[in-house]
Amino acid sequence: MKVLGLETSCDETGLAIFDSEQVTSDNKGLLGQVLYSQIELHALYGGVVPELASRDHIRKLVPLFNELLQQCNITKDEIDAVAYTKGPGLIGALMTGALFGRSLAYGLDIPAIGVHHMEGHLLAPLMGANPPAFPFVSLLVSGGHTLLIAAHGIGQYEILGESIDDAAGECFDKAAKMLGLPYPGGPNIAKLAESGNSDAYSLPRPMLHRGLDFSFSGMKTAVHNLIKDTPCSGGSGNGSDSDPQVRADIAASFQHAVVDTLVKKCVKALKQVNMSRLVIAGGVSANSHLRKTLERELAKINATVHYAPPALCTDNGAMIAYAGYERLQAGQADDLAVSCVPRWPMTELPAV
């Protein structure tokens, strides 16, 4: 079965084709994928502008679809089903992909299914070279979400913890903006932190010893105050008198605080549910400091960590195609009505 996946939940336009008959140890059925990022568009504003995101998806969907067909060397008539991101995300952006996908499926007389964006991230590591077996704990960490989930099977999800305010990725972006770094903040903070001392400044770890929920708003405030009160930080009010080492130390200290919080919660979650496999997915999962720290700390408790392939860490169509395939195989499909859900708890998903 060839499934076209469409991802338009935020600022990436991602399309991919998953072919269940081409699953090998090398590509796990990914026939091809194309991805267009709107980073340059939104960098001018320091963050994603929803209306601009929607309009850009509209401009890019058809050209990217044609490019994907050419890359895979197939025609549209060879597509067997369509999977599109139904939510959560920016409602206008979601609607562009949903309407394109549902219309294409109707025209080709093939089934279509709306996919949960975060389930796509959760299942993306199953497309890797060393896919984890259920059950496992999953840390879904991105610009819009920070979730700890006990996954017992596809659609069998138990929320162990989540952010009660800002997501970890959002905190990265805002801290980067305070330091005068360009959007997106996560990769730029990580790059700057490489030359910094993570022990230079002490930052709080909110709710570290209070269950499995997360809170990053206090950390964001602490970074703001640190930058404001530190000479030569290059941040708000200090831009003309900046010291590269001071800025690198702040970035490294901030990154270490976020990573320390995430890792300790993951270890606690694994112990709480008596599992030994951790899956980490979402844009922040690409952070090398997070990966190294997780591998070191999980080795101490005889647990393993699994990631999505590098190209599938950020938003992409491949994860949507694969998640859609799994649900289509279980006999699930949507009717002609198109609906998108900006907020959608994963616990509401049906089991496969």
From Swiss-Prot:
InterPro entries: ATPase_NBD, Gcp-like_dom, KAE1/TsaD, Peptidase_M22_CS, TsaD
Gene Ontology molecular functions: iron ion binding; N(6)-L-threonylcarbamoyladenine synthase activity
Gene Ontology, cellular component aspect: cytoplasm
PROSITE patterns on file: GLYCOPROTEASE
GO biological process, one term: tRNA threonylcarbamoyladenosine modification
Residues spanning the membrane: none
Predominant location category: cytoplasm
Catalyzed reaction equations: L-threonylcarbamoyladenylate + adenosine(37) in tRNA = N(6)-L-threonylcarbamoyladenosine(37) in tRNA + AMP + H(+)
Broad class of enzyme this protein falls into: transferase
Binding locations of Fe cation: 117, 121, 315
Necessary cofactors: Fe(2+)
UniProt subcellular location: Cytoplasm
Family: Belongs to the KAE1 / TsaD family.
Task of the protein: Required for the formation of a threonylcarbamoyl group on adenosine at position 37 (t(6)A37) in tRNAs that read codons beginning with adenine. Is involved in the transfer of the threonylcarbamoyl moiety of threonylcarbamoyl-AMP (TC-AMP) to the N6 group of A37, together with TsaE and TsaB. TsaD likely plays a direct catalytic role in this reaction.
Name under which the protein is recorded: tRNA N6-adenosine threonylcarbamoyltransferase
Organism for this UniProt entry: Psychrobacter cryohalolentis (strain ATCC BAA-1226 / DSM 17306 / VKM B-2378 / K5)
Gene expressing this chain: tsaD
